[in-house]
Amino acid sequence: MIKLGIVMDPIASINIKKDSSFAMMLEAQRRGYEIHYMEMNDLHLEQGVALADTKVVELKEDPSGWYQFKSEQTIALSELDAILMRKDPPFDTEYIYATYILERAEDEGVLVVNKPQSLRDCNEKLFTAWFPELTPITMVTRKAEKIKAFREQHGDVILKPLDGMGGASIFRVKEGDPNLSVIIETLTNHGQNYCMAQTFVPDISNGDKRILVVDGEPMPYCLARIPAKGETRGNLAAGGRGEPRPLSETDKKIALAVAPTLKEKGLLFVGLDVIGDKLTEINVTSPTCIREIEAAYDISITGKLMDAIERRLKATAM
């Protein structure tokens, strides 16, 4: 029996209709795995050994009570076969410390999904810089005058922090916007923080597409997140609506261009954000949208993920 750990946000407050971590656990349970639930504060290190206070959990597809803890124990993480790191951003120093603890478990033979070092290396906004031919024109800086010059040159632009999620603090700035200076001050914390400027992609009205890539294989369907009327952000958390769709030829091309790098870096489950024909983000921490896509199409994305985990476990056991 496979022992699977999962580090996530509190299970009591998830929305099971939309939660991808819940979908992953349901599939693992269907396969007979023993599931060890953990939150960040359950992880600890002693003399270089990674440990955790875990709760073995059973799940049900029931909005009135979707989980039950069966037992509580403190274990060495090396007792687990695999661990899903599914903690949502913010990607802060606490998150980074947790990846070091998980890396100690990885050193002892545990498969950690996604790979802890790659979680640190591949910032969701900045990692697109390794694929400049696929992205909108992009600049990352702390300097207000550079952002203003970028806006001057490109007209309609998007400004965003490097550490947000769910569309938080994303601004669209057009010519003559009287708020440009205060937006820059807010995003850069008066020149103390980097922020990203990108040319605006008008195709956002047709949706910000979330494309899932499992172990280097793009899934054939995506979730297009359509902005609410008068909005420029498609994020569901910002009021957008999700529309499952098959991948277009352009979507496939973008996903296949990025996929080999993801696989090589041990990023088994990744969400690409694509607007029109431009890659805008590479989400590696806790990508979502599984539930919406699986509800619309005859596909088990979680099944493909567990297959990939089992393949890797078999390969290391040989």
Swiss-Prot record:
Residues given in the record as Mg(2+) binding sites: 281, 283
InterPro entries attached to this UniProt entry: ATP-grasp, ATP_grasp_subdomain_1, Glut_synth_pro, GSHS_ATP-bd, GSHS_N, PreATP-grasp_dom_sf
SUPFAM superfamilies, A to Z: Glutathione synthetase ATP-binding domain-like (SSF56059), PreATP-grasp domain (SSF52440)
Signal sequence bounds: none
Domain ATP-grasp: 124-310
Catalytic activity entry: gamma-L-glutamyl-L-cysteine + glycine + ATP = glutathione + ADP + phosphate + H(+)
Binding-site residues for ATP, renumbered to this chain: 150-207
E.C. number(s) listed in UniProt: 6.3.2.3
EC top class named in words: ligase
Free-text remark on how the cofactor is bound: Binds 1 Mg(2+) or Mn(2+) ion per subunit.
One family name in Pfam for this protein: GSH-S_ATP
Family: Belongs to the prokaryotic GSH synthase family.
Alphabetized UniProt keyword annotations: ATP-binding, Glutathione biosynthesis, Ligase, Magnesium, Manganese, Metal-binding, Nucleotide-binding
UniProt GO MF annotations: ATP binding; glutathione synthase activity; metal ion binding
Cofactor section: Mg(2+); Mn(2+)
Listed GO CC annotations: cytoplasm
Transmembrane segments: none
Pathway in which the depicted protein is active: Sulfur metabolism; glutathione biosynthesis; glutathione from L-cysteine and L-glutamate: step 2/2
Protein name: Glutathione synthetase
